[in-house]
């Protein structure tokens, strides 16, 4: 199942991107109108059952409505650094082997699909990085690797931006270089984990950084130093995760961006595509 947020008549609606854009709040017969609220309320299973039973006459979103950010106020966005060896080499670094490197991003960094990524004029080289984002479906704290993925509601394509020139001055500037406005894009759809796994094991899922329509770098989840389950389990022993939190699992390769570029994240071969212009 896929869920998408669209803006229509000054409001945001969650819809099924099924051709009709059926409104999820009408399918559920009420409840939270936003995707984060649906996750917090634990309504995904009920929604899946209702959709399996068949969606007949229900209100639909105007198909010309623009796609919005899936949600804008997660309690936590956790990013992972240097989780692919090849990307670590791009920066002249070694990929961490004993435990993952991580950082937090504020929700002010969020933009939606198709919205501009703004490169500040005074920070030098900026890169965009395609990543697989895990969306947490229920509160998760101190869980084992074997059970970690049961706490994941689904996945989203992510574009995580970095002020790389500043980072190369001093790696302790990591929080600073990751937290400029528009430095985190995700969407357009939340793809539930069962749909992702129906296409094959997560380890085989391809993650690709796109630059002006061409593949800049790609790899599969199997190429990660720490698997998604290991990342979530490890960090759940540091901090609790809550529904709607996003764990962005690292990039196979970063691409320098300048105004006029279009960058993208593709998951699988056509499973999901996120693009943003650069200004």
Model-derived segments and their meaning:
Residues 75-78, 100-102, 108-109, 116, ...:
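Structural motif
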Residues 67-69, 90-92, 117-126, 140-147, ...:
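A generic local secondary-structure boundary/capping motif
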Residues 23-27, 93-94, 144-156:
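Short Gly/aromatic-enriched secondary-structure transition segments
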Residues 108, 113-150, 157-161:
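Non-heme Fe(II) oxygenase catalytic core, chiefly the N-lobe of the double-stranded beta-helix
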């Amino acid at each position: 199942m896929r869920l998408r947020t669209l803006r229509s008549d000054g409001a945001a609606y969650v819809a099924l991107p099924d051709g009709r854009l059926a409104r999820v709040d009408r399918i559920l017969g009420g409840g939270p109108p936003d995707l984060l609220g649906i996750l917090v309320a634990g309504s995904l299973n009920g929604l899946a059952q209702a959709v399996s039973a068949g969606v007949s006459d229900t209100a639909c979103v105007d198909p010309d409505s623009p796609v919005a950010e899936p949600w804008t106020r997660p309690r936590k966005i956790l990013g992972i650094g240097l989780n692919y060896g090849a990307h670590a080499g791009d920066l002249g670094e070694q990929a961490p082997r004993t435990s993952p490197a991580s950082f937090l991003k504020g929700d002010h960094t969020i933009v939606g699909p198709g919205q501009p990524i703004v490169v500040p004029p005074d920070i030098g080289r900026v890169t965009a990085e395609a990543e697989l984002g895990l969306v947490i479906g229920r509160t998760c704290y101190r869980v084992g690797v074997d059970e970690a993925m049961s706490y994941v509601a689904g996945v989203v394509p992510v574009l995580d931006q970095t002020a790389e020139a500043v980072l190369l001055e001093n790696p302790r500037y990591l929080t600073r270089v990751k937290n400029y406005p528009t430095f985190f894009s995700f969407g357009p759809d939340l793809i539930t984990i069962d749909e992702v796994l129906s296409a094959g094991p997560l380890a085989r899922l391809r993650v690709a950084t796109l630059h002006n329509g061409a593949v800049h770098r790609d790899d599969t989840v199997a190429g990660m130093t720490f698997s998604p389950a290991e990342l979530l389990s490890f960090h759940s022993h540091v901090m609790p995760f809550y529904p709607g939190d996003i764990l962005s699992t690292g990039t196979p390769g970063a691409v320098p961006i300048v105004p006029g570029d279009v960058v993208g994240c593709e998951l699988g071969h056509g499973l999901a595509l996120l693009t943003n212009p650069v200004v």
